[in-house]
């Protein structure tokens, strides 16, 4: 972090910024890249395999994608995202990836410094966000090429680091390092402030003496504290626009049952890693109980199996439920996850086990935990079952922490009467600008707006950058 940004954050009064980005994960990094003047154009000789998109691209030669009509360009595109702009940017960056191809991007990038918009990116961690909190050796779900940001492919970065991609997939540590390196290589570091915790984002008309504003237009006030040398330094900044890019890993989901606060109950895989390192959990221990039927739970099963730690794996759904994520993953790309799914299907707690040390407990409801390290379940027939365990991992998802917003952000959700949820009730945004439908100047991107894969969050950055550039162009001098 540059000293200028530290000074800027430490000041309680300054000229309002055009943009503050809250969150420094892939979404925030990509948006910072676009706001720093890096501008995408179609290569003059590029031919896109999608005929309709190719025709539209030839209609405006020499015009940047940011300056074109994103609604028009994205019309007719289909893919694995509900966001039309996400599909558009993905199609431009990776034209035939869904068909197994490796065609190069049809985009070329120019650095137009005169179009840069001053901004600051606030994050608790180093650039890369929650990727720095994931166990580094864990192989990531997505193919490595889908984790990359504009104009620096993960594959090329890995080769320069004298490393190769295993099965086209990288580790979480690789990706965290890549994102941090991306900020450095693209010269974005002066925009980023790590160790910044945002505690409030409020909208109102400031006292001109407090923010140096030239007029009395309403602004966002972003308050919080900067952690430095084990001390907390408060800050308060004003901005015309705020972009929420915090992701959803802030607050692990909880079961809400008696005993969940007991010390042997955990909600992160790192607890099992720590217990294994210090010998608190061994192959001779009582089983580790893993709750959940998603990829985080599968990662925990794989980790425990690697260290020969006995596992009871419990989940509410049936193993053949089409909604299970395992039923949506290609077996060739994700053999280890399909192995877990096979174990879940075959290893009922009531049947003999060809997989020593693993038992599944499908379609069971967890009732409570007891202080003597026992977990009480109920099956479909209402029969209670009690198991002794050494440690419990509750891995059933996570929720965004938007406690810094009024009403924890629920007022901005698609259904304001329900809790905010990245999968079921995201922030309601315009699909072509990602601006909140309920608050001018407030944007949301990434999982908060319903884009849950790095591959598609970049489309949100494109939409936000295009909208902000239009605003700044219209703003009177």
Curated annotation (Swiss-Prot):
A biological process term (GO) from this entry: cell differentiation
UniProt note on tissues of expression: Ubiquitous. Highest expression in the ovary, testis, kidney, skeletal muscle and liver.
UniProt signal peptide: none
Subcellular location: Midbody
Cofactor binding note of this UniProt entry: No monooxygenase catalytic activity in the absence of NADPH.
Sites bearing Phosphoserine, chain numbering: 12
Entry annotated with the keyword NADP: yes
Cofactor: NADPH
MF annotations from Gene Ontology: growth factor activity
InterPro entries per record: FAD/NAD-bd_sf (IPR036188), OKL38_fam (IPR029731)
Entry's EC annotation: 1.14.13.-
Keyword NADP: yes
Induction: By pregnancy.
Function: Monooxygenase catalytic activity. Involved in regulation of cytokinesis; promotes RHOA activity, probably acting locally at the midbody in late cytokinesis. Monooxygenase activity is involved in stabilizing transient structures between daughter cells, termed intercellular bridges, before abscission. Regulates differentiation and proliferation through the regulation of cell death.
PANTHER family listed in its UniProt record: OXIDATIVE STRESS-INDUCED GROWTH INHIBITOR 1, PROTEIN CBG05349
Name of the protein described by the UniProt record: Oxidative stress-induced growth inhibitor 1
Source species of the chain: Homo sapiens (Human)
Lineage: Eukaryota, Metazoa, Chordata, Craniata, Vertebrata
């Amino acid at each position: 972090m540059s000293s200028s940004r530290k000074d800027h954050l430490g000041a309680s009064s300054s000229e309002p910024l055009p943009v503050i980005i809250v969150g420094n994960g892939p979404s925030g990094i990509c948006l910072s890249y676009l706001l720093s003047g890096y501008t995408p154009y179609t290569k003059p000789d590029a031919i896109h395999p999608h005929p309709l998109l190719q025709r539209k691209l030839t209609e405006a030669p020499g015009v940047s994608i940011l300056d074109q009509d994103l609604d028009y360009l994205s019309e007719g595109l289909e893919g694995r995202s509900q966001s039309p702009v996400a599909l558009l940017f993905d199609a431009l960056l990776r034209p035939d990836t869904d068909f197994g191809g490796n065609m190069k991007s049809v985009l070329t990038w120019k650095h137009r410094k005169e179009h840069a918009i001053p901004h600051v990116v606030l994050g608790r961690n180093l650039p890369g966000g929650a990727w720095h909190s994931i166990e580094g050796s864990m192989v990531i779900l997505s193919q490595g090429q889908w984790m990359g940001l504009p104009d620096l492919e993960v594959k090329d970065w890995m080769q320069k680091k004298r490393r190769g991609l295993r099965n086209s997939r990288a580790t979480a540590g690789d990706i965290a390092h890549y994102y941090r390196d991306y900020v450095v290589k693209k010269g974005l570091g002066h925009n980023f402030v790590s160790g910044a915790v945002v505690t409030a984002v409020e909208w109102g008309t400031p006292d001109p003496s407090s923010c140096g504003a030239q007029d009395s237009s309403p602004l966002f006030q972003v308050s919080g504290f900067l952690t430095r040398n084990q001390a907390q330094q408060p800050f308060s900044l004003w901005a015309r626009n705020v972009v929420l890019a915090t992701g959803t890993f802030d607050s692990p989901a909880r079961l809400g049952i008696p005993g969940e606060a007991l010390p042997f109950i955990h909600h992160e895989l790192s607890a099992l890693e720590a217990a294994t390192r210090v010998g608190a959990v061994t192959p001779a221990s009582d089983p580790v109980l893993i709750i959940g039927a998603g990829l985080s739970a599968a990662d925990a099963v794989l980790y425990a199996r690697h260290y020969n730690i006995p596992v009871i794996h419990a989940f509410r759904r049936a193993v053949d439920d089409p909604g299970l994520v395992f039923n949506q993953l290609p077996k060739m790309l994700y053999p280890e996850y399909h192995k877990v799914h096979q174990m879940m299907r075959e290893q009922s707690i009531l049947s003999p086990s060809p997989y020593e040390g693993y038992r599944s407990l499908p379609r069971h409801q967890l009732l409570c935990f007891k202080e003597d390290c026992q977990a009480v379940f109920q099956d479909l027939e209402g029969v209670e079952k009690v198991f002794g365990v050494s440690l419990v991992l509750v891995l059933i998802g996570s929720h965004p922490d938007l406690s810094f917003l009024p009403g924890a952000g629920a007022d901005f959700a698609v259904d304001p009467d329900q809790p905010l949820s990245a999968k079921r009730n995201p922030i309601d945004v315009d699909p072509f600008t990602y601006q909140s439908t309920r608050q001018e100047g407030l944007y949301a991107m990434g999982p908060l707006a319903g884009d849950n894969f790095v591959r598609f969050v970049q489309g949100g950055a494109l939409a936000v950058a295009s909208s902000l550039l239009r605003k700044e162009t219209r703003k009177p001098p």
